[in-house]
């Protein structure tokens, strides 16, 4: 038999980020797979309380990095509800697969034989869940989407601070071609959004990892030279994500130096591109990351201070802007761009003071 395939279209904070595609193991756990499939299509109508038996519009209510993302509670939305197509709960069907890899679909439960509609997607190996939770499917495509969910900021009870919503879902036609891996977007970037999810990068080989990061950086530079600052920013950010995920403890001194150099360079490039596309907060964060690297040289430090100061200036925070810009000028006293920026910020601060003076003078001017 051919196993059914389904999809989720996901939004974070109201912005659609893409689709996740799944294969359901109907050949091994047909009852569990059918429950999930029907909840994707919504074909079974409503619960007794009149709530649609449908994942559409429901959320991922629990997210734990390096563990799993959980959803499927379309009745309460907080992990206390949900219902299967067979009634409120149904028994554990079988345990044919271990939780031995990321991107498996497994049933959430409150103990033995309490399956409803809640599910989770693993983001790493979770062997402690074996023979307790029914694995009934796997992800076919959309690793980057799951990783974005996994990395969304959470608050109490591991609940995402921004809603992570299944805005659409359904079953795929038999002839639908699911995109495999990360499809080249036309720039030469055929890498997944997160380092450890790549089949074409050996995370145990520094040359393979650093080669991928260098390629992403060069793609970003090419896009920048072509006038595509927004596209360049995406590639530089992707390179920094790879660098943040790459923390082996057995690197040679030569490779450690390469990692530091790449990290500083990529953060500086992110800061520059972010300023060009009017994302000053991104620029400030990236420049700060460059400054935090203990190997940053004075020339790069001056660039980072200049770009962070420019970010503060864009946010009309002239105090912090001048602090950074003056520090940059101390390192590069002959740099005309820094001098010009300092003068520009001083003038902006003066105009602000004069405007405020004029505004408040009216409160005490008589009539």
From Swiss-Prot:
TPR repeats: 213-246, 264-297, 302-335
Assigned GO CC terms: cytoplasm; intracellular membrane-bounded organelle
Catalyzed reactions: [protein]-peptidylproline (omega=180) = [protein]-peptidylproline (omega=0)
GO MF term set: cyclosporin A binding; peptidyl-prolyl cis-trans isomerase activity; ribosome binding; unfolded protein binding
Keywords: Cytoplasm, Isomerase, Repeat, Rotamase, TPR repeat
Protein origin, superkingdom: Eukaryota
One of the GO biological process terms: protein folding
SUPFAM superfamilies reported for this sequence: Cyclophilin-like, TPR-like
Main location: cytoplasm
The keyword Cytoplasm belongs to this UniProt entry's keyword annotation: yes
Compartment list: Cytoplasm
The keyword Repeat is annotated on this UniProt entry: yes
Entry EC number(s): 5.2.1.8
InterPro entries on file: Cyclophilin-like_dom_sf (IPR029000), Cyclophilin-type_PPIase_CS (IPR020892), Cyclophilin-type_PPIase_dom (IPR002130), TPR-like_helical_dom_sf (IPR011990), TPR_rpt (IPR019734)
Span of domain PPIase cyclophilin-type: 7-171
Pfam family, one: Pro_isomerase
PANTHER family assigned: PEPTIDYL-PROLYL CIS-TRANS ISOMERASE (PTHR11071), PEPTIDYL-PROLYL CIS-TRANS ISOMERASE D-RELATED (PTHR11071:SF561)
Role, per record: PPIases accelerate the folding of proteins. It catalyzes the cis-trans isomerization of proline imidic peptide bonds in oligopeptides.
Protein family membership: Belongs to the cyclophilin-type PPIase family. PPIase D subfamily.
Protein name per its UniProtKB record: Peptidyl-prolyl cis-trans isomerase D
Source species: Yarrowia lipolytica (strain CLIB 122 / E 150) (Yeast)
Gene name as annotated: CPR6
